[in-house]
Design a protein with these regions (language model features):
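Aromatic, loop-rich ligand-recognition surfaces of beta-strand-rich domains
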Residues: 33-187
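Aromatic-rich transmembrane-lumenal/periplasmic boundary elements in polytopic membrane proteins
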Residues: 152-200, 387, 406-456, 460, ...
């Protein structure tokens, strides 16, 4: 049977493409690494075994203390929280002064209560907490403590054990690591209180892990940075940042496969490069970077399969992109369940491709018979052979690729935490974890000031406020907020609505051709597969960052609609350049609220252009 010559060479990467995407990735990475986090953090500390262990800090003179900093570590107890009660010497006795509650670790906590005294008595007590079940914790690891008089770090003092089973001097042995003020650069913020700690627990093979509401793979990947650079902010953020940078080559490949054009591949990558959420979310030590990366990968290979006829490639070669798509699906699901939503879209695209290809194969077969290149008697036999190989057998392989292999990857992702002393085998551990995670997410209903509903995300009606810098100079601020670049998200949502109309009415097919129209369904289906499940998801407390994996598909739809408008001469290439320039300008203007850069408070307020934008 005659076939068309090969796959469109325009979809292949050439030297020019490699240079472009390499430069873009390196430029982005250089920007993303600026002030990512400190390579140093306190490593030793005081870990009292009993309640009410205490020590005295003697300054040898009367000093005015107006700030006390405290950095907490993981210690050896799961409930590594507690409270330090601090009493001040008034000349006759120690009187109550202040408390520092350690409810989170690997960050600098502080009190600004002031006192004039020559000595302090510090005692560990049960954690002061609103919930009764939290008040039992006291086995904290206090890694470093510091005293300030004004902006000056007080260094001249002696420490005496009063009632302590551990070496208290370890609480004051890394004073050079004390920052002038606490900030994200020196410690955890937002959900980093969960994931880096859990990654360390997995590395140390702890019997109980802290964050158990998502599969382990994301924490395993995060832990690679900790293994290489240590338990410090740079160490726990670097892997997510690298995956964020690697999303750019994936975006370029998606654009290249989709449009067969270097400019549009560059255009798509550029928009992702300067999208706000991509920058913010991948610099945060959570697991969303890995999830979005794997979702992009699974759709890249499904696009590769969907965009070419399997019978032209040959049976064995046609299975390769399906295998790779399934592997990425498994990796995504082993990181965060939301990646599994993409399976709905993958199934739609796969079965649509089988129907479309059968129609195309039959059309070509009939043409070959009409040209007497095939015998009419062979028609039924050839069609049955096609269906057996390219539908039945391919579907059977898809059971392996999209069910068995992902399930295996998911199960194997639990190996790093299999050494826990709970008596369960690996499969039992996975099943118990799945039940626990489902019940947890179904039961998350407590209100949150920055939660938002699924229908608010495309218009960014309620961004997520991640970080507010404490102890800032008068009139200055430091903030990190999670939102999208307005020109990417708002234009993208308009492109999504336009794409539905253009595809359903066949306008893209008439202007850009049937192949581009066919591929145009990929970002639309991908977007809907990741977005619509949130309408019916059992989890009711949701946030705008749940929309992150949808962003690459919005960008592809922007490019598709602009290509169509160019095709009908409604706009020229200049419009794309103007959009790209405007996206960059907005990224620069909003950079302080994306990076935590200290800026005048009035400027940060000016950036709040919608009523519920708050930082």
């Amino acid at each position: 049977m005659p076939t068309r010559p090969g796959v469109d060479p325009g979809s292949r990467m050439n030297k020019r493409d490699l240079v472009i995407v390499t430069v873009m990735t390196l430029v982005y990475l250089a920007i993303a690494l600026i002030n990512l986090g400190s390579l140093e953090a306190p490593q030793t500390g005081w870990e009292p075994d009993r309640i009410n262990e205490s020590f005295v800090v003697d300054f040898g003179r009367e000093v005015e203390i107006d700030r006390i900093f405290l950095f907490g570590g993981l210690g050896h107890a799961w409930g590594c929280f507690g409270t330090l009660e601090i009493m001040a010497w008034d000349g006759d006795e120690f009187v109550p002064y202040t408390f520092i509650d350690m409810k989170s670790i690997f960050r600098w906590l502080y009190t600004t209560d002031s006192v004039k005294t020559s000595k302090l008595l510090v005692r560990n007590t049960y954690l002061r907490a609103e919930k009764e079940e939290d008040r039992r914790y006291f086995k904290a690891e206090y890694r470093e403590m510091a005293f300030f008089s004004g902006n000056e770090l007080i260094r001249d003092f002696t420490v005496t054990d009063i009632n302590s089973s551990q070496d208290v001097s370890l609480l004051f042995d890394e004073q050079d690591l004390v920052p002038d003020r606490p900030s994200f650069y020196y410690g955890t913020y937002f959900d980093e209180i969960y994931f880096p700690r859990t990654a360390l627990e997995q590395i140390e093979k702890r019997s109980i892990i802290y964050e158990n509401t998502h599969p382990p793979l994301g924490k395993t990947l995060l832990g690679i940075g900790i293994r290489v650079f240590g338990m410090n902010p740079f160490g726990w953020r670097i892997m997510g940042t690298l995956f964020g940078a690697l999303m750019l080559p994936l975006m370029y490949l998606l654009g290249k496969r989709m449009f067969r054009d270097t400019f549009w591949a560059f255009f798509c990558t550029y928009l992702l490069m300067f999208d706000f959420m991509h920058f913010v979310q991948t610099r945060l030590a959570t697991i969303d970077s890995y999830t979005a990366f794997f979702v992009m990968g699974t759709y890249l290979f499904m696009l590769d399969y969907y965009g070419a006829w399997a019978f032209e490639r040959g049976f064995a070669r046609s299975l390769v992109p399906l295998l790779l798509s399934g592997i990425f699906l498994g990796l995504g699901g082993a990181t965060k369940w939301v990646a599994l939503y993409s399976a709905f879209g993958l199934a739609v695209l796969f079965f649509a491709s089988r129907v479309q290809e059968y129609i195309e194969y039959r059309r070509r077969l009939d043409a070959a018979i009409a040209q007497k290149k095939e015998s009419p008697d062979s028609r039924g036999k050839l069609l049955r052979a096609y269906v057996l190989k390219y539908f039945v057998l391919t579907c059977l392989f898809c059971v392996l690729f999209f069910i068995i292999i992902p399930a295996t990857i998911y199960t194997l992702s639990y190996l790093p935490i299999q050494d826990r002393n709970d008596g369960r085998n690996l499969v039992e551990e996975v099943i118990a974890s799945i039940k626990h995670m489902y019940e947890y997410h179904k039961g998350v209903t407590e209100p949150h000031p920055y939660s938002s509903h699924w229908y608010e995300w495309p218009l960014m009606l309620r961004p997520m406020y991640y970080y507010s810098g404490p102890l800032m100079p008068e009139g200055m601020g430091s903030s990190i907020a999670c939102l999208g670049n307005p020109l990417v998200w708002w234009t993208g949502f308009a492109a999504f609505l336009s794409m539905i109309w253009l595809l359903v009415t066949g306008r893209i097919k008439r202007i850009l051709g049937p192949e581009e129209s066919r591929r145009g369904w990929v970002p639309l289906v991908g977007y809907l597969s990741l977005y619509l499940p949130w309408v019916v998801a059992p989890r009711k407390l949701t946030f705008i960052y749940h929309y992150f994996s949808c962003v690459p598909f919005l960008i592809l739809m922007i490019a598709a609609v602009m290509r169509y408008m160019e095709g009908i001469k409604l706009i020229g290439r200049r419009a794309s350049y103007i959009l790209m320039l405007s996206v960059l300008v907005l990224f620069i203007l909003y950079y302080p609220v994306l990076s935590g850069l200290v800026a005048p408070r009035w400027y940060l307020n000016v950036l709040r252009i919608l009523p519920r934008w708050d930082w």
